[in-house]
Amino acid sequence: MQITIRGHHLSITPAIEENIRDRFTQMTKHIDQVNSMQVKLSKDHQLDKRSKKGSANHIAEAIVRLPGIELFAQASADDMYNAITKLTDKLKRQLDKHRKMQLDYQPMEILAT
C-alpha cells in the first residue's frame, strides 16, 4: 500500500508523518485491497472581523483507492493531530461499511426448473 502525504501551507514534520502512517496502517490492516492513499494536510487562517484576531483551522483530507471504488473524507480541528484522528475515524467507518457490503453480497443462484 502506498501512502502519499502532502502539506498545503504547512510543512510535514516527521512526527505528523509517523502518526499518519501508524493510524492508516492500523486502520487498513484487515483490508488487503487498498491500492493507495493520498493524504493532504492544510492550514486555513481565518480572521475574526470583530476582534481582528486570527485562528488557524487545520484540515485533513484523504482519498483511499480500492478496486472499483474511491473513498474520500475530510476533517477539521484546531489541532492537526485531532484533525487526523477525526479523519481516520471517518475513513474507518466508510471502510467498515464497504467491507460489510462485500461480505453481505451473495450472488443469486439460478434454480433449474
UniProtKB/Swiss-Prot annotation:
Presence of the UniProt keyword Zinc in the record: no
Entry keyword annotation includes Cell wall biogenesis/degradation: no
GO cellular component, one term: cytosolic small ribosomal subunit
GO MF annotation: an example: ribosomal small subunit binding
Gene Ontology BP annotations: negative regulation of translational elongation
Keywords in alphabetical order: Translation regulation
UniProt protein name: Ribosome hibernation promoting factor
Organism: Acinetobacter guillouiae (Acinetobacter genomosp. 11)
Record lineage: Bacteria, Pseudomonadati, Pseudomonadota, Gammaproteobacteria, Moraxellales
Gene assigned in the entry: hpf
